[in-house]
Amino acid sequence: MKLDVLRRYRAQLEEVLRMDLFILRQDLLDAEAISRQLDAHLRLTTDAYLAKAGEGVALDEFLVWQSMVAAETSKLAAARQVEGRLRKAWNQKQDELREAMQDRRKLDRLAERMRQQRHLVQHRVDQIEMDEAARRASMM
C-alpha cells in the first residue's frame, strides 16, 4: 500500500473519530442535563414530603410518597448509569482519537523523511551530472 493512500486513510479515520467524539459529547451533555433535572425534581419531592410529614401523614399517603420517591430515585440511578456509560465511551473515543492522531503524525514524519531522501538523491544526481558536464567541458 502506498504511503499517501495510508496517510489519507488515517486522516479519514481521524475525522470519523472526531465526529463520533462530537456526537458522544452531545449525548453526554444531554444525559448530564437529564440527571440534573431528575436530581432537582427528587429534591423537590423530598422537600415536599418532609414538609407534609411535619404536619403528619396517614399510612396510605406515606406509601404514596414513598413510592414516588422510590420511582424518582430509580429514574435518577438509571440516568446516572447512562451518563456513566456515555462518559466511559467518550473517554475511550478520546483515546482512540489520540492514537489515530499519533499514527497520522508518524506517517506524516515518514513521508517528510522520504521526501527529503528523494530530494537528497535528486540533488546528488544533479551534482554528478553537473560534474560530468564540467569534466567534459574542461576536456575540450
Question: Which residues does each PLM region occupy?
Answer:
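Charge-rich amphipathic alpha-helical interaction elements
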Residues: 1-140
